[in-house]
Amino acid sequence: MEEKIKFYFEIIDFQNQKFKIQEFTSKLIGLKEESFTTFKPIVYEKYLNWTQSIEESILKTNGTINKSIFEEIFSYCGYIGEFLEYEPFIVFLKFTTFGIILDDYIFEKINSLNMKLNEKEKLINSLIYYNNKNENKIGFEFWEIINEFQNFTHKESFQRIINANSLWIKSSIDSRNISNSPINSRCSFNEYFEKRSSDASGDFILTISMIGIMDNYIENSIIESKEFQTINYHAKSFFLLINDLYSFNREINENDLLNYIKILAIQLNSIQLSIDKTIELIIDHYLKFLSSIETILKLYQNDQSTYQLLKQVFQNSNKILSGIYFAHKKSKRYN
């Protein structure tokens, strides 16, 4: 008899099941734990002053966001943005902080906020479209931060940051409407990936990797190539699954299926087996990410300008994936 399709996760079905995330760092050959230290004290003081002003004037949270949350975000960005110089790191830090606040404090509650429908639409449009930024103060401030990236990246790469941001906002808001979610207990990983990779911020990996490269950019023909998209797929899959793995404990009592471990748990009738399978997928996608880089670099060995550009971008991407792994592993936000 075929298993009944489910659209919700019910923890009662897995009562008394014990589970544990096994250590697997040694199997991620190529990952290195690094966090910036050079200008950390200076940045941290500026950062806390900025978060205070944002809370008071823009988010109107009046200091209700615990200081430890900002400390966690600061540490998280220290891992992921380790390759950045001082000034672009400041912008990356503000951008990531604002994104997490939007995700955790605004998008998470957007359907329950005491806002009229047209006010919600203005807020969303102000975050997605530059020409609508004046419709909402939050959107205006967000665009002020995004525009600072222009000082540290090529104009073509900057446009890709904007595109990734718009896609993330749309996907992040849409994913919270469980009743319209096409994700169900029979989803394969690729089906799940298609629905979740954008709202999980995966599109930022390769765009952020281009920050700091002012004099060159990756041509669209390369970006759109099968070889490049394969790298992008494995990087985004790694990010999505790492996020699912280390946020599962926090999300276990929520009944949505916005975590692949929940889908696997229903399929396998075991949380532990679903965690083990997720770890296998993480390792597989990371190793394929590395091998796919080798494949595309071989294609451009006779074009040193493109070769060196791609090599730099992929080195930055690998540092970002390393940061994602160690930040998730150690952060209280994901445990």
Curated annotation (Swiss-Prot):
<dbReference type="GO" id="GO:0046872">
    <property type="term" value="F:metal ion binding"/>
</dbReference>
<keyword id="KW-0479">Metal-binding</keyword>
<dbReference type="GO" id="GO:0102145">
    <property type="term" value="F:(3R)-(E)-nerolidol synthase activity"/>
</dbReference>
<dbReference type="GO" id="GO:0051762">
    <property type="term" value="P:sesquiterpene biosynthetic process"/>
</dbReference>
<dbReference type="Pfam" id="PF19086">
    <property type="entry name" value="Terpene_syn_C_2"/>
</dbReference>
<comment type="similarity">
    <text>Belongs to the terpene synthase family.</text>
</comment>
<feature type="short sequence motif" description="DDxx(x)D/E motif">
    <location>
        <begin position="103"/>
        <end position="108"/>
    </location>
</feature>
<dbReference type="InterPro" id="IPR008949">
    <property type="entry name" value="Isoprenoid_synthase_dom_sf"/>
</dbReference>
<keyword id="KW-0456">Lyase</keyword>
<protein>
    <recommendedName>
        <fullName>Terpene synthase 4</fullName>
        <ecNumber>4.2.3.-</ecNumber>
    </recommendedName>
</protein>
<feature type="short sequence motif" description="NDxxSxxxD/E motif">
    <location>
        <begin position="243"/>
        <end position="251"/>
    </location>
</feature>
<comment type="function">
    <text>Terpene synthase that converts its substrate farnesyl diphosphate (FPP) into the sesquiterpene (E)-nerolidol.</text>
</comment>
